[in-house]
Amino acid sequence: MSYLILVRHGQSVWNLEKKFTGWVDVDLTENGKLEAKKAGDLIKANNINIDIYYSSFQLRAKNTLKLIQEVLQDTKISEKAWQLNERHYGILTGLNKEEMKIKLGESKVHQFRRSWDLRPDPLDKKSSYHPINIEAYKEIPINKIPDTESLKDTYERAVNFYKQVIENKTTNNNILISAHGNSIRALCKYLFKLDNDQISKLEIPTGNPLVIHLDIKNKINSCKYLDHERAKDLVVF
């Protein structure tokens, strides 16, 4: 039996400013750093030893993982995967969510954020927010870099990576993944067999480890958030 731990990065600067972030490489707020350290404290208090670490390519996820490992005093090298990046929000990138609710209506913004296969219009490649213009993504093949994505698109890349690279390692290893709200929602849809309606309602809190207990056949025995006060409804448990 083993543990799979999913951690959404701690609060980022653009989380605080209520902006659509997507692939823009913003860092953690001071509160986000505290959330990451608390995540490490909770993992340590539950006596869970991590064998393998993964994070997305994005600074907020990498720094969350760095702070967790510092608390755990664990110097293992983590594996970085762009497939675990946040969903790309296309032309919405950098815009304020509350302002967009006023401009487009709350239901339309909710559709953009939570529908399964709706993509916002693509982001102009000349934008400084476009991933092709961000140094962190120079290693990614240009034909893999999105202009916009739906949750379905995010699901396909994140879950394909999980199935191809991570899943066969979960039998004998405790694995921690530091990622993002939508890439973690995508993984939860796969792991918990959620339908499209359920996934639209799933909220992932920042910096709160979701611990999934797997049996020897990779079936889920149980799961829980370690920070009970900030836990969200898991829909299926």
Where are these regions (language model features)?
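Short coil-to-beta-strand
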Residues: 2-11
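Active-site-adjacent alpha-helix immediately C-terminal to a catalytic or transition-state-stabilizing loop
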Residues: 4, 62, 70-75, 144-145, ...
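A conserved hydrophobic position in a structured secondary element of the catalytic/binding core
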Residues: 7, 104, 179
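Short, well-ordered beta-to-alpha junction loops that form the rim of enzyme active sites
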Residues: 10, 55-58, 83, 114, ...
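Loop-to-helix element that buttresses phosphate recognition and phosphoryl-transfer chemistry
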Residues: 11-69, 79, 142-160, 201
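Phosphate-coordination/substrate-recognition cap region in phosphate-metabolizing enzymes
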Residues: 40-131, 137-139, 189-213, 237
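Short, well-ordered strand-loop elements centered on a beta-strand within folded domains, enriched
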Residues: 217-230
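Short, cationic low-complexity segments
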Residues: 229-237
